[in-house]
Structure formats: structure tokens, C-alpha cells
Amino acid sequence: MTAHCPEDPSLERHFKGHRDAVTSVDFSLNTKQLASGSMDSCLMVWHMKPQTRAYRFAGHKDAVTCVNFSPSGHLLASGSRDKTVRIWVPNVKGESTVFRAHTATVRSVHFCSDGQSFVTASDDKTVKVWSTHRQKFLFSLSQHINWVRCAKFSPDGRLIVSASDDKTVKLWDKTSRECVHSYCEHGGFVTYVDFHPSGTCIAAAGMDNTVKVWDVRTHRLLQHYQLHSAAVNALSFHPSGNYLVTASSDSTLKILDLMEGRLLYTLHGHQGPATTVAFSRTGEYFASGGSDEQVMVWKSNFDIVDYGEVLRVQRPPATRASSSGTLPEVDPLVPPGRGRSQESMQSHSQEPVSVPQSLTSTLEHIVGQLDVLTQTVSILEQRLTLTEDKLKQCLENQQLIMQRTTP
């Protein structure tokens, strides 16, 4: 039986309509809609079906910092610098309900898996939980001592995780409203956090350019990635739990293979910081947004082949990796607080895999050529933009001359 290598991710579509940096993206349940928030104070709902007009929702008085579809896809929540949360019906009417949520910027909004409640995080240092349909404040979690950038429910709705500028990630029990554990290993502000689809792990991104993965049962640091050259602004787990995508101020997106504990792909698409990223509910697509005002939709491709099958063929039987939904302990990490380089992370405690030298050389050559191709395309895009600008200027000058010469 032959196993085919996963294909590279490909840029499927890109949407232009925002007038300032994109701050957040999220897919609806059926992947037919994609929502994005922006510093331009608007919320856009894009349709994946070609030639379908997007919805622009204007209601917030300041920058929209976060968006999240309800599990059913019938509602869409947004948070803003105007200190409010709005719950929208994502149709052409764009009707919304306003929650006077916080006393400072709302940084994050996330629905519980049952859709009955949602959690918000704010610069007022609090995390708040709300009833969706009764439109009522339920309770507040307030142990952070600086801005709270992000808060998420666990898949089963029992836990809440929050990330803060106080350099901690806190795990909360929703029922007791107590802080279960504080993770303090980040060396800078923690920008984003999310639960693994299994609910057994969390991943957090930081201004210290790192991504860290912890077990929420043992609170052990499982994986530590230092692959970006600037702050990591957002991350998203693939629904299978096998992959993680990150967005960074170094303008790249990176796909991490969590089963192997290594970098799979680096994607260059945005001109400037990549500010947000999210997988679709099926994992077939992921979307990214950036300070370049663009929303990009990528086809995953790499998840098409059954992951367990690939490993079974490529690896000796003794070193097969689990293809279950739980995140394996890929390799023992050094004690928390001590950094590790990318090279040591990839080489530490890994079984040797027999790969012919000729194949290795060929693959390295292909990777090098792809990097050259990526840079070439980027340069061509820049030149095309300059040409378009010059052509536009020529046309405008021609129109002015025509107007002056017309009696």
C-alpha cells in the first residue's frame, strides 16, 4: 500500500473590503460564511460562494477587536474598543443586540459549545460570562492584574482559559468560578490562548515569539515552539488536533505538526503583520487577516491524507504515533522556564528515521527553490502594484488634460 505525502496549503481566495487592519476572523459552522473584524470599526461577513456580495455591519463606535460565530452559525458575536459586545444575526439586515460589557476595550468573545453562554475578556482586567438568549450578565473572573487579551471555553464547557498581559495563562472552573491553575512560563505578554479539540491541552501564543502547549490535567508543559521572529498574535487548532496554525507580526503563518513536534509549513501571504488566523469547523480551510487590510482563505490540503496511515508507512512499527484526538507527549521538554532552540526541539529524544541521502538532498533543493519562488512572486506582486498605481496616475492626468482642453 502506498501513502501519498500531504499537499501544500494553497491560497484559495482573498477578500478586500476593510479600510484598516483586520483583527479577527471566524468561520460559520457550515463554512458558507466567514466573519472578520477590523480597526475600521466594521464587521464583514464574506460568502465562500463566488460572486456573492459581502455584508458590512456598522454598529460599533470604535475598532472591532474580535468576532465569533455561535456553534449553530445563527448568531455572530463581536467585541470592540467601544467597550461593548454585539450579537448579530448574520443576514442582509444585520440586526444586533448590544451588551454594555466592560469598562474598557473588549479583546475577546467566545461562545460556549452549547451556545447558551459566551465569555468575554477585556482591558479592564476581567473575564465575564454572559447568557446568550436572556442577554444577562452571569459572573466575573477577576484575578488577572493586567489587560486580558483572550478567553475561551473548553470544548465541554466546564473550563475557561484566559491569557493576559500579566504574562500568565489562567485556567478557571466554570462551576466553582475558581482559578484552577496559573501558567507563568511566558516571558512576555500572552496574546492568545485556545483549547485543543480534545479539551486535554491548551496552547498559548506570546509577545516573546513563542507558542507553548500545556496539559490541563497535569499542568505540565508539553511543547515549546520558538519558530517566529516576532510576536505570535493568534493560533488555531485543526479539528483533528494534529496541527496548529499560528499568525505572527513577522508577517508569516506557520503550520505546526503537533504529533511530531515540528514545523510543517511557513506561509508568506500578508504584507506586514499577520494578526489573526482560524481553521474552519471541518479543517478543510483556514483564514488569516493582517495589518494589510486583507482577509485570505487557504485550502489546508495537508490534512487530506489519513495521518495515522502516513506514519504507519513512513515509520518503523516500534515508533508509530497515535492518531487519536488526544495530543501525545511528543518529546520530553526541558524544565519550564529554560528555553530551547528550534534545532534542539526537533532533534531531542526522537527516533532515527531511515531516509536515503539522495532523497534528503532533493527535498532540501526543492525547499530552497520554493523559497526563491515565494520571494520572486512577492517581488512581482510589488512591481504589479507599482505599475497599477502609475497607470492610475497616468489616467487621472489624462482626464485632467482632457478637461482643460475641452472648450
UniProtKB/Swiss-Prot annotation:
WD-type repeats, residues: 17-56, 59-98, 101-140, 143-182, 185-224, 227-266, 269-308
Main localization category: cytoplasm
Entry keyword Repeat: yes
Region: Disordered, residue numbers: 317-357
Subunit architecture: Interacts with POC1B.
Family label: Belongs to the WD repeat POC1 family.
Protein name listed in UniProt: POC1 centriolar protein homolog A
